[in-house]
Amino acid sequence: MPTSTAIYSGDLRTQSVHTQSGETYITDAPTDNQGKGAGFSPTDLVATALANCMLTIMGIVSNRNGLAIEGTEAKIDKSMGTKPRRITEIKIDFYFPMNFSNDERMLLEKAAINCPVAKSLSSDLQQNVQFHYPSS
């Protein structure tokens, strides 16, 4: 059984369905590439998937270690290059609502930067990841 199904709807838009859950989303080409920008672009999803994967893996590590990271927010920005058109950099800033010891921070940060999506992307794509904690 496939993981998902994607259908081209026309007008530079796709609709995707997650097979197991039935959840759907659309993509729309960005305004700088002939689209309407009415939804995530495919490259937006790549950048967002990286942050989602990092949050998920940090969640797994936090569960194993009795930590709580609920409410942690990721701000994601991507930079595009040309010739060929591609993502050149993904910048992610994580904002934790709670503080952690240095050892706990290292554990969470190592988990994030080693997530499966991070390790699957080209080494040509710069991943700039910053972690922000409340001031003590």
What spans do the regions from the language model cover?
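Alpha-helical metal-binding/catalytic segments enriched in His/Glu/Asp
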Residues: C53-M54
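Extended beta-strand/beta-hairpin segments
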Residues: M1-T48, G59-S136
